[in-house]
Curated annotation (Swiss-Prot):
One of its GO terms (cellular component) is efflux pump complex. NCBIfam families: PRK11556.1, RND_mfp. This is Multidrug resistance protein MdtA. It comes from Salmonella paratyphi C (strain RKS4594). GO terms for molecular function: efflux transmembrane transporter activity. It is found in: Cell inner membrane. The keyword Cell membrane applies. Part of a tripartite efflux system composed of MdtA, MdtB and MdtC. Belongs to the membrane fusion protein (MFP) (TC 8.A.1) family. Residues 31-57, 391-413 are annotated as: Disordered.
Length: 413
């Protein structure tokens, strides 16, 4: 029994080994047959990929049509807003400051009361001057009465001619004294008036320079407060010396040159004024000239020492051919645009540009009104290629679509 079992186990192991050997031999014999099939499929796949790239969708672009417009010509420069007048308010008399009649930052008018110096000493001085004047007026009246009597007595030779002349001289002297007294009264009155410190100009007051209770003097350089006149307000900016002739020519033609003030980022128009004057010399260091413009500034959009961008309108070019700035490209040979024909084929065309800003460019030569130019999708263009002109919304939707990106990746693969 034991020998019989051993024999059966030996047969089973032999069958397993034989089956394994047969499977190994069969798999080796099929692999050479399968390889030619795979290799045969490769050229077909590559060819299909190339056909897919050739037959893929047209490159989408956005386009604009060249138009004719009246284009303003601006001269631009950097500038600083300055107050039309800046006045340091000082006391013209010495004394104790007893009151301030303004709030810091307040808008004041010329003649408004700003501060009060203790007027006591000036009132006393005025009273003394007025008293002396009254005394001398009485003396003059008495001298004139004596003179009248002397004149009557002189007719009867009761007084000498010398006495009459002496009395006349006394009257004249007293009249001179009264004139001096009147001047003293006026001076004392002026000192009293000056104890009331008023605004010399209209404008905005700054921070106070002295507190109530301090003894102040007419020699104090800091003053009491500084007033800046901001209605109107001035803008001083610079232009290259090459622009001087254009400005002078416009002035001689009698034009009122409009100046615009824009914010620091040059994105928001702050105010509009007019050219006031040009400086009388060029800065040799920078080769620029200073220009002053004046603004009414009723809305207080401009503030002293504010940095702004200035634009001055000097001329307007009529019937100029204009295209969006995005259409104009720069290459080794200069500026160019991609022009579309009726079949939406593109071609590169050199142009000469003129006036330009952030949005539009004037084409001085190379284009005509009505020509279509590519404004977006330029990086995908080649000479003579046919494109698909789409609206901006369509292009944005296509760029955000995952399926389109996946399709493009597949074509490139």
């Amino acid at each position: 029994m034991k020998g019989s079992n051993t024999f059966r186990w030996a047969i089973a192991i032999g069958v397993v080994v034989a089956a394994a050997a047969f499977w190994f031999w069969h798999s080796r014999s099929e692999s050479p047959t399968a390889a030619p099939g795979v290799a045969a499929q490769a050229p077909h796949t590559a060819a299909a990929g190339r056909r897919g790239m050739r037959d893929g969708p047209l490159a989408p672009v956005q386009a604009a049509t060249a138009t004719t417009q009246a284009v303003p010509r601006y001269l631009s420069g950097l500038g600083t807003v300055t107050a039309a007048n800046t006045v340091t308010v000082r006391s013209r008399v010495d004394g104790q400051l007893i009151a301030l009649h303004f709030q810091e930052g307040q808008q004041v008018n010329a003649g408004d009361l700003l501060a009060q110096i203790d007027p006591s000493q000036f009132k006393v001085a005025l009273a003394q001057a007025q008293g002396q004047l009254a005394k001398d007026n009485a003396t003059l009246a008495n001298a004139r009465r004596d003179l009248a009597r002397y004149q009557q007595l002189a007719k009867t030779n009761l007084v000498s001619r010398q006495e009459l002349d002496a009395q006349q001289a006394l009257v004249n002297e007293t009249q001179g004294t009264i004139k001096a007294d009147e001047a003293n009264v006026a001076s004392a009155q002026l000192q009293l008036d000056w104890s009331r410190i008023t605004a010399p100009v209209s404008g905005r007051v700054g921070l106070k320079q002295v507190d109530v209770g301090n003894q102040i003097s007419s020699s104090d350089t800091a003053g009491i407060v500084v007033i800046t006149q901001t209605h109107p307000i001035d803008l001083i900016f610079t232009l290259p010396e090459s622009d001087i002739a254009t400005v002078v020519q416009a002035q001689k033609a009698g034009k009122t040159l409009v100046v615009e003030a824009w914010d620091r980022t040059n994105s928001h128009k702050l105010s509009e004024g007019v050219l006031l004057s040009l400086d009388n010399q060029i800065d040799p260091t920078t080769g620029t000239i200073k220009i002053k413009a004046r603004f009414t500034n009723q809305d207080d959009t401009l503030f002293p020492n504010q940095f702004v961008n200035a634009r001055m309108l000097v001329d307007t070019e009529q019937n100029a051919v204009v295209v969006p700035a995005a259409a104009v490209q720069m290459g080794n040979e200069g500026h160019f645009v991609w022009v579309l024909n009726d079949e939406n084929n593109v071609s590169k065309k050199r142009v000469k540009i003129g006036i330009q800003d952030n949005r539009n460019v004037v084409i001085s030569a190379g284009l005509s009104a009505g020509d279509r130019v590519v404004t977006d999708g330029i990086d995908r263009l080649t000479e003579g290629a046919k494109v698909e002109v789409v609206e901006p919304q369509t292009t944005m939707a296509d760029e955000k679509s995952p399926s389109r990106h996946e399709g493009q990746k597949g074509a490139r693969a």
